Curated annotation (Swiss-Prot):
Record's keyword annotation contains DNA-binding: no
WD repeat ranges, renumbered to this chain: 155-199, 201-242, 322-361, 365-404, 455-494, 507-546, 594-634, 746-785, 829-868
Compositional bias segments (type: Basic and acidic residues): 1039-1056
SMART domains: WD40
One Pfam family this sequence matches: WD40
InterPro entries noted in UniProt: EF-hand-dom_pair, WD-EF-hand_domain, WD40/YVTN_repeat-like_dom_sf, WD40_repeat_dom_sf, WD40_rpt
Chain's gene name: WDY
Disordered: region residues: 657-687, 1026-1068
Keywords on record: Repeat, WD repeat
Protein name: WD repeat-containing protein on Y chromosome
C-alpha cells in the first residue's frame, strides 16, 4: 500500500509523494539523484536554451522530464518524483532556471570537504587547570623532558588523526615537565601537572633533545647577544660525547678547542653576525634541513624598517624575511611549509618558506606585542599570545578570527608580565608558567577509549529523518541545526546560532526545543525556548519565514499539516498559522484555551484530530479541521468524564471578539482592538477551575498510531506518564481510556519519547535513564478478530533479548506478569536521558538523540552502528538494504561498556553468554574433559539453586546466637507516608558511674602555683663589651605579707600586686 500525500488543495498538479517505504520497497541498485555528476557543460548549455525557449521561462513536472530525457538522463517514476520535489523549492510545482542551477550548486556544496572540518565548539572550550608552582620565586624556565623528539624523520611521518586511544597519557609518549626558577630550584611534574620530585642546581641549565634514530645527528643551537648563531652537531649513539668517563665527574670544553677539532665527537658550525641584534629565537628544521633565526629591531631610527626580522639558512643560501621591529617568536609548520611570526608590532604574519618577499596573510587584532605563536596543522588553526596575556585563535586557511580567550587576565596578576609559555604538541596543551602553573587544552583529541565523540555541543533535543533527501536532521540546545548523511556518517550542513536574542547589547543563542518537516518534507520548522518559530530551507541554510507565539513562552511541540502550522507550548493553547501562498503573514488564529497548565507534548492524526497534553496531566482531543475540542481526560482518573466548558469570562471575551469583528471599522483598528483585548484576557491566571489543579503526574510524550482506525475498540493514542506507565486511549468521540502498562524497569524512570514503524507493529521508546525499549504492539488494544499469530522463533532470531537465560533479568522481571504488549528488546543506549527517537523503515534503523550531546544509530535488534560526528570509521549502510549482519562482530559504545548490565551486553554485542554445552564424540580427549568439567559445574550450580539449601546453611564453623524466650511483637505506625524507625527503638536510661577518689599526688599537683618556682632574671648591657651580661639576682625571700594568697580582702590583694609591679619597674 503506497502512501500518497497531495502537496496542496489548490494545486492542479498530480504530484504524489511516495517514500522508499511505499510500494517500491526495493530497487535493483542505488540510483544517484545528483545531476551535477551527470550533466556536462554542453548538456548544461542545452538545458539553459530549453528553459529560455519556454513561454514563461519555467517548466512543469512533465516538461522537465522530457527535457532531461532528450539529454539521455532518465529516471524511473519514483526517483524522478523525488528529484522534482528537491528542485522545486518554491513549492509551486514549476521549476525555473534559477531553481535548477541552485540544486546543482547544493550538490557540489554537500561534497565540499571543508564542511566536515568545521568545529562544533570553540577551540578553547574547557576550563583551565591551575596549580601552585611550589617555587619560592616566579618560574623563569619551562621545558618538556621526552624520550623522543617532537621532530620525526620524513620517512616516519604519518597522517595525523584527531583522536587517540589514551596512549598519550604514558610518560614515554607525553614526557614530563621541568620547571626552574632563579634561585636554582628545579621541579619535575607529570604530564597532568602532578609533582614528582624537587632538585636544585647552581649552574645554568641548557636543554637539548636526542633523536632515537642513530643516523640523524643531534644539534645544539646557540644564539648570543651579538647576533651570532652556532650549531654543535654530534651523534647520539651511546650518548655521544656525554658518556661518563672514569675519574672525571665534570668535563669542561672550550669553544676554541671545539672549532680546532680537538674533540672529534663534535662537529661545529658558525654563522657570524647573522643578525645585528640579540637572537630572540632559533629553530632547526629536520625536514627542510634549514636553520631559522630571528631577532628584534626596536630601534626604528637606526634600521628604518629595513631589518631582516627572520633569516632562514639552507646550506649556504640565506632568505631574509623583512619585518618592521623584527620578530620575537615564530613557529615552523613543516607539513604545510609555512612559518608564522609574531613581534612587537602586534601583527601575526603567515609566510611561505619559499616566498620570503611577502607574507601570505597578516592577522590583526592584538593590542600588545606577540610573545608566542604556534600552529596546529591537523586542525588548521593558529594560536597567538600577546604581552597582555590575550590568546587569539585563527583559521589557517581562511585567515579569520575564531576565538578570543581572555581568562589568563583573570587568573594571573597584572604585575606578572614575564611569563613562560610552552606548547605540548602531543597532548595539545598550552602551559603558562609564572607564580602559577596553568594548563589550557587547545582542541584536545577525542579519547575514543572513553567516548565515540559528540554530535552537538549541547544536549540534543530533536532528531528527524527526512524521507525526501534521505538524511538526518538534528537540533540541539546549542541552537545548532546539523544535517547528516546517515549512510556515510558525513556532516552535510551545519547552521549555528539559528535562534538568537539580544540582551543588553549581546546576542544570546536560544535553545531549540521542537522541530518538524512540512508535508512534502522540503522545509524544516523549528521552535525555540523564547517562543520564536522559523521555517528553514535547510539545504542552503536560509530562513524562509519568522513567526512567534507569546513572548518568552517555550515552544514544546510543532505540527505542520497541509496549509496550516500548529505550534503550542507554555502559552496553554494552540496557535494556528496559515501556510497558503498569499496569506502567510496574516494574524494567527488562537484555538480555544481549555488547558489550565503548560502544554508539554502533542501529536496529530492526519485528517482526523490532534491530541495535546499538559504538565498537570490534562489530555484534550481536538478536531483537526475545525480546531474544536471534543473529549477531555485526566491521567489521574482517566475513566472520569470531564465536561468541556469555558468559564464565564472566556465566553464573554468570545462574544465580544465576535461583535468587534462584525463591526465595520476603518482600516485594521478593530483587529488591533481585538488582539489587545485577547491578550489581556488570556494572560490572566486561571486558578478558579475545580479540575486539573495540583495534579502531581505529568504527561511526557504522546503518540498517534496512524494506521489504526477511529473506533471504540482500537487503542490509537499512547500517553506516557512520569510514573513510568503508558496509558492507551481511543480517540473516538465515545472512546476513552482502555488500558495501561509499565514501560520501565527502574524506579524513578519514565518514557520521554516514542515512535513506531510505518505499519505500527513495533513501539520504540526512550527513557530518562537512557534505556531503549522495543515493544511488539501489533496485537495490543485491537479487536480479537484482527489479532494475528505471532511467530516467537522468528522474533527470537531477530531480537536476542527474547532468548532464554539461566536467570530472569531485571527487565524481564518487570514485565513477567504483563501479557501485552510484548517486550522484545531492552538495553541501555545512553548515559543520560533520551530526548528524541525515530525510525527508518526500510533499513530498520533506530536513531536516538540524548542529553549526553550524542545521536546514535542502532539496528532494530539492538546492535550499535555508530554515533553521528564520530572520528572513527563509519559502518557501511545503505537506504535500500536492511542494516545489521549476524556474522558481523559489533562493538559497544565505550561509555556504555563501563556501566552495562548483562542484558545490555548481550543485546548490543549480539552474543549469548550462557549456552548449554553438549559433548560430541568427535572431539579430542582433552576437549571432552574440559567440556565435561564445565557441564558438571553448570549442573552443580543448578542443583544448588533449584531447591532450598539444607541446614546448616553456614556450615559447622559458625553458630547463630540463640533467640530469647519472649517473642517481642513490634507494632509499626503506618498512618503516615513513612515509618519513623526511631520511635520503635527501645532506649535504656543511663546510670551514673561511681566516681573514684582522687590520689593525693594528683591533688597536690592541682593546688600548686607556678609563681612559687618562678625566679625573674635581670639583664644589664655592658657598654664596654659586645655581649650582654646576664646577672642572676639572689633568691627572693618568702615573705608571707607579700603573698596575695594570704590576704583576705580583694582590695588589699590589688594594692600588694600594684606595689610589686612598681618595684619590678624600678629595678629594671
Amino acid at each position: 500500500m503506497s502512501v500518497i500525500l497531495n502537496a496542496s488543495v489548490n494545486t492542479k498538479s498530480a504530484v504524489e509523494y511516495r517514500t522508499i517505504s511505499s510500494t517500491q520497497s526495493h530497487l535493483a541498485e542505488e540510483q544517484s539523484e545528483r545531476l551535477h555528476k551527470w550533466i556536462s557543460k554542453d548538456q548544461l548549455e542545452k538545458l539553459h536554451a530549453a528553459f529560455l525557449n519556454t513561454p514563461e521561462r519555467h517548466v512543469g513536472i512533465d516538461e522537465l522530464r522530457i527535457i532531461l530525457e532528450e539529454l539521455d538522463i532518465t529516471f524511473n517514476d519514483s526517483m524522478y518524483t523525488r528529484l522534482f520535489l528537491k528542485i522545486n523549492q518554491n513549492r509551486d510545482f514549476k521549476v525555473d532556471w534559477n531553481e535548477f542551477v541552485s540544486y546543482l550548486i547544493f550538490g557540489f556544496q554537500e561534497e565540499d570537504p571543508s564542511s566536515q572540518k568545521e568545529s562544533l565548539i570553540l577551540p578553547i572550550s574547557g576550563p583551565p587547570m591551575v596549580r601552585k608552582s611550589e617555587h619560592r620565586s616566579a618560574i623563569c624556565c619551562l621545558a618538556l623532558l621526552k624520550a623522543k623528539s617532537d621532530q620525526v624523520p620524513i620517512d616516519e611521518v604519518t597522517e595525523t588523526i584527531n583522536f587517540s586511544f589514551g596512549g598519550e597519557d604514558s610518560p614515554e609518549a607525553s614526557g614530563m615537565w621541568v620547571t626552574a626558577s632563579h634561585e636554582g630550584m628545579m621541579r619535575f611534574w607529570t604530564s597532568h601537572m602532578e609533582p614528582i620530585r624537587t632538585a636544585s642546581s647552581e649552574s645554568i641549565v641548557s636543554t637539548y633533545a636526542f633523536y632515537n634514530n642513530g643516523k640523524v645527528h643531534s644539534k645544539l643551537i646557540l644564539g648570543d647577544y651579538a647576533g651570532n648563531v652556532r650549531i654543535l652537531s654530534y651523534s647520539p649513539h651511546l650518548r655521544g660525547p656525554f658518556q661518563a668517563k672514569p675519574g672525571a665527574a665534570l668535563i669542561e670544553v672550550i669553544w676554541s678547542d671545539v672549532l680546532k677539532g680537538k674533540i672529534p665527537q663534535f662537529f661545529p658550525k658558525e654563522y657570524i653576525n647573522l643578525h645585528n641584534e640579540m637572537i630572540s629565537c632559533v629553530y632547526f628544521s629536520l625536514h627542510m634541513n634549514a636553520l631559522f633565526a630571528s631577532a628584534e629591531y626596536r630601534n626604528t631610527k637606526k634600521y628604518r624598517g629595513r631589518c631582516p626580522g627572520m633569516i632562514m639558512v639552507n646550506y649556504d643560501e640565506r632568505s631574509n624575511f623583512r619585518i618592521p621591529l623584527g620578530v620575537s617568536t615564530f613557529f615552523v609548520a613543516e607539513s604545510h611549509n609555512i612559518v608564522v611570526t609574531g613581534g612587537p608590532d602586534t601583527f601575526v604574519r603567515i609566510w611561505d618558506v619559499y616566498i620570503p618577499t611577502e607574507p601570505s596573510a597578516i592577522l590583526t587584532g592584538h593590542n600588545g606585542g606577540i610573545v608566542l605563536v604556534f600552529v596546529q596543522p591537523e586542525e588548521n588553526k593558529v594560536y597567538s599570545v600577546d604581552y597582555q596575556k590575550i590568546i587569539k585563535v585563527w583559521d589557517l586557511h581562511e585567515h579569520t578570527l575564531l576565538q578570543t580567550y581572555g581568562d589568563l587576565v583573570r587568573l594571573i596578576h597584572h604585575s606578572e608580565t614575564d611569563m613562560t609559555y610552552y606548547y605540548h604538541s602531543h597532548l595539545q596543551e598550552l602551559v603558562v608558567a609564572g607564580r602559577k602553573l596553568i594548563s589550557i587544552k587547545c582542541c584536545p583529541r577525542v579519547r575514543v577509549d572513553l567516548a565515540d565523540g559528540n554530535t552537538h555541543a549541547a544536549p540534543v533535543s530533536v532528531v528527524l529523518y527526512n524521507r525526501l533527501f534521505r538524511n538526518v536532521v538534528s537540533c540541539g540546545l546549542d541552537s545548532y541545526i546539523i544535517v547528516w548523511d546517515p549512510w556515510t556518517g558525513r556532516r552535510k550542513i551545519i547552521m549555528k546560532s539559528c535562534h538568537t536574542k539580544m540582551i543588553y547589547g549581546e546576542i544570546i543563542d536560544i535553545e531549540i526545543t521542537a522541530a518538524c518537516f512540512d508535508p512534502l518534507e522540503q522545509f524544516l520548522l523549528t521552535g525555540a525556548r523564547d517562543g520564536s518559530l522559523k521555517i528553514w530551507n535547510y539545504n542552503n541554510a536560509v530562513v524562509v519565514r519568522n513567526m512567534s507565539i507569546m513572548p518568552d513562552q517555550e515552544v514544546t511541540a510543532v505540527i505542520w499539516v497541509v496549509d496550516r502550522i500548529l505550534p503550542m507550548g507554555w502559552d496553554w493553547q494552540v496557535t494556528e498559522f496559515n501556510d497558503v501562498v498569499g496569506r502567510e503573514y496574516g494574524d494567527p488564529k488562537k484555538w480555544p484555551k481549555f488547558h489550565t497548565d503548560d502544554i508539554t507534548c502533542a501529536d496529530v492524526k492526519l485528517g482526523e484530530g490532534v491530541v495535546t497534553a499538559t504538565y498537570s496531566g490534562e489530555i484534550i482531543f481536538w478536531k483537526l479541521e475545525t480546531g474544536q475540542p471534543y473529549r477531555r481526560y485526566s491521567v489521574m482518573d482517566p475513566t472520569r468524564f470531564i465536561e468541556l466548558k469555558l468559564t464565564a469570562e472566556e465566553e464573554k471575551f468570545i462574544r465580544q471578539s465576535k461583535r468587534l469583528a462584525s463591526r465595520p471599522t476603518p482600516g485594521n483598528h478593530g483587529l488591533q482592538m481585538g488582539r489587545a483585548g485577547r491578550s489581556t484576557v488570556l494572560n490572566r491566571p486561571e486558578d478558579n477551575r475545580d479540575y486539573g489543579t495540583d495534579i502531581p503526574i505529568s504527561v511526557q510524550a504522546v503518540l498517534f498510531l496512524q494506521t489504526r482506525p477511529q473506533t471504540l475498540k482500537h487503542g490509537s493514542v499512547f500517553i506516557s506518564l512520569d510514573t513510568g506507565f503508558i496509558q492507551v486511549y481511543s480517540h473516538h468521540q465515545r472512546g476513552g481510556y482502555m488500558v495501561e502498562f509499565l514501560a520501565v524497569h527502574k524506579t524513578g524512570d519514565c518514557v520521554l519519547t516514542m515512535c513506531t514503524d510505518r505499519k505500527n507493529r513495533y513501539l520504540y521508546t526512550g527513557t530518562a535513564f537512557g534505556y531503549i525499549k522495543v515493544w511488539h504492539i501489533e496485537n495490543f488494544c485491537v479487536p480479537e478478530t484482527e489479532k494475528i499469530h505471532v511467530c516467537m522463533p522468528k522474533l527470537r532470531l531477530e531480537f536476542i533479548f527474547l532468548r532464554k537465560e539461566l536467570f530472569l533479568t531485571r527487565a524481564k522481571r518487570a514485565v513477567r506478569n504483563q501479557a501485552e504488549p510484548l517486550l522484545v528488546s531492552s538495553y541501555k543506549g545512553h548515559l543520560k536521558a533520551i530526548n528524541s527517537i525515530s525510525f527508518i523503515n526500510l533499513p530498520k534503523i533506530i536513531f536516538t538523540g540524548s542529553h549526553d550531546y550524542s545521536c546514535r544509530l542502532w539496528t532494530q535488534g539492538g546492535r550499535y552502528l555508530g554515533t553521528l560526528g564520530t572520528v572513527l570509521p563509519w559502518s557501511k549502510l545503505t537506504p535500500f538494504e536492511r542494516a545489521g549482519n549476524d556474522n558481523h562482530l559489533y562493538r559497544m559504545p565505550p561509555d556504555i561498556k563501563k556501566v552495562a548490565s548483562s542484558t545490555t551486553l548481550k543485546v548490543i554485542s549480539g552474543i549469548q553468554a550462557e549456552t548449554r554445552i553438549k559433548i560430541s564424540d568427535g572431539k579430542p580427549v582433552e576437549d571432552r574433559e574440559e567440556d565435561t568439567a564445565q557441564t558438571e559445574d553448570v549442573t552443580e550450580l543448578r542443583k544448588l539453586l533449584d531447591k532450598p539449601v539444607k541446614e546448616p546453611i553456614l556450615g559447622k564453623h559458625f553458630e547463630l546466637p540463640g533467640r530469647s524466650v519472649l517473642d517481642q511483637h513490634i507494632e509499626l505506625d503506618t498512618t503516615q507516608s513513612y515509618i519513623a524507625v526511631f520511635t520503635q527503638l527501645k532506649v535504656h536510661s543511663t546510670e551514673m558511674l561511681e566516681r573514684l577518689p582522687t590520689p593525693a599526688v594528683v591533688s597536690r599537683v592541682q593546688t600548686e602555683n607556678y609563681l612559687d618556682h618562678y625566679i625573674p632574671v635581670e639583664g644589664k648591657v655592658d657598654v664596654s663589651g659586645s655581649a650582654i651580661n646576664i646577672k642572676q639576682p639572689s633568691r627572693r625571700r618568702s615573705d608571707k605579707t607579700n603573698d596575695t594568697r594570704n590576704v583576705r580582702t580583694p582590695r588589699a590583694r590589688d594594692l600588694i600586686a600594684l606595689e610589686m609591679s612598681s618595684s619590678h619597674a624600678s629595678q629594671s
